[in-house]
């Protein structure tokens, strides 16, 4: 399952199961369930996050990817006790809520870290507060250009870590740095995923 935001054309884009959007009636039934059982006022994002989690629970999924809406520490998705935290980049954005420096923003993003759980960081220049939070929680940190790296050629690209080297990877529709970070995340998962599956997914 994948929960992402914002949507571009239709709300249904936010919640995908087995790479498929869900029909309107599935969402409205979930909305009704949340509305009947909520005990306090919810923001739009909190409501949609709860609905997504409800749908994922009904589907009995093995893996769920939750995209943080804003920051991390106070984000609605942070209600979930995740098994793996992924930081793609650290940019100056939403400064009214997250702080005006990369250091302040990195602290907010590090709010999704969990004690003794793996963390994958795709940002090459990691601010100290994020590293300190990972150390404080005894997280296993996998960092770009430290634990893994990638390089593009003319027609393909390669990715390597301390454990494995993947060559002749096809280019995909997302930024290469994000794809490389995703591969670093895959390496942390307790699943045996073949190189063929990785190439097909890219």
Where in this protein do the model-derived segments appear?
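Acidic, Mg2+-coordinating active-site environments of NTP-dependent enzymes
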Residues: 62-67, 82-166, 173-199
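A short glycine/serine-rich beta->alpha loop
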Residues: 38-41, 167-173
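Short amphipathic beta-strand/extended segments with alternating polar/hydrophobic composition
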Residues: 21-26, 162-170
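ATP-dependent carboxylate-amine ligase catalytic core
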Residues: 2-80, 96-98, 104
